[in-house]
Amino acid sequence: MPVDQEYIYSLLRKYKDRTATEAEKEELVSWYRQRAERDSVFPEDEHVVAESMRVRLHHEITRPQHDRRRQWLAAASILLIIGVSVGLYLRPTAGVDPGDITPGSHQAMLVLVDGTKISLTEAANGNIASQENIQITKSGDGQLIYTLAPNRQGTATASGYNTIETPKGGQYQVVLPDGSKIWLNAYSSLRLPLNFSEGAERRVELKGEAYFEVSHQPTRPFTVVSGQHAVQVLGTHFNVKAYADEPDIKTSLLEGKVRVTAGTHSVTLAPGQQSRLAEGNITVAEIDTREAVAWKEGYFMFDDERLEDIMRSVARWYDVEVVFDNDALKEETFGAVTTRFTRISTLLEIMEQTGDVQFRVEGKTIHISSKQPV
C-alpha cells in the first residue's frame, strides 16, 4: 500500500526539526530503502546533490552487512541524506552562491626530465610529449597514458624520471606501458621512470596519496617508494597514503599480496588489511577497504573519524585553509558517506547536522567552532 506523501513529509519535517522519535526515524529508514530500490526520493532537477548521495549510499546499504556498527553507519547516513534533502526541499529555491567553493577536478602538471612543465589542465587531448622510447598522451577523461614507441618495444635506453603533480583541488589518472593504472589524489606527486621497457625496474616514487592497480608480471616486481617506506608487489590492487602533514603512512590492500618495508621492519599484507608506519614502527589492522579507496570512487566515507583528519582531506580537495577555534574540536568524531563532487557549503551543512560543530566560510578559509545552543 503506498505511503501517504504528506505523512512522509511530516516525518521529514520532524526529523529536520530534531523532534522525530526513534520509531519515526526507523520508519523513515524503512521508507527510504524501499524508495531507493525504485526511483529517486526527490525531484532530481532540484536535488542533484541529494540524488548523488543517494546513489552512493544505495551501493553501500545493498551490500551484505555483518557488522552491527556498519549497519548503524548505513542507517545514520540514510537519515543524514534525508535530513539534508528535506532541508533543500523545504527551503525557498535560490540561485547558486557565486562565492561558494567548488569541488576539485582533473588537474595536474607534468614535469619532464629536462624540467619542461606541461599543464594537463590546459593541454589539448592527444600526444603531448615523446621521450626516447615512450610516448605520452592525454585523454579527454583525465588520463595520462604512457606507451612504448612502436620501434622501441623491448629496448631499455631511456633514463631519468618524469613527475606528475596534482595541486590542492586536483586529481589525475596515469596508465603505464605495462598496463598498470594509478589514480593520484589531490596535493600529491608521482615520479615515473622513463624506462618501462621489458627488463626495466618498475619503480615509482609517491608523495601524497594514490591508488594502484598493478599488472601481474612475475619476473618484474612493482615498487612504490615514499621516503623510507616501500611497498613491493607483483600484481595487485592497493592504496598508499603518504602525506607529509600526516603522522603516519598507510597502505591498504584490496587484492593480491604486498610487502611493506621501512628500515629493518617488514610486513606482508593480505586483502582487507592496512599497515600503518608511525615513528619507525609498522602495525597491521583489519579494515573496511571501501573507506580507504572512497576518494578514488568519488566520495567521502568517514566512520567515526576525528574532525582534524577529515578536514585535512576536505582542505586538500577544496583547496581551502581550516582554522579551529579550539583544539578540543579536532577530537570530535563523525560518520558519513557523501559525494566529493558537491559545493563545500553542502558538505559543511551535512557535517553540521551530524555533530556539535558549526562552520563559517570566509573566502578560502573555513572557521570551525562549537555549535551554539538554539
What is the meaning of each model-derived region?
Residues 67-74, 85-374:
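A residue-level detector for the "anchor" residue at the start of short, highly conserved motifs
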Residues 19-20:
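Charged, low-complexity interaction regions
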Residues 12-16:
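Regular secondary-structure segments
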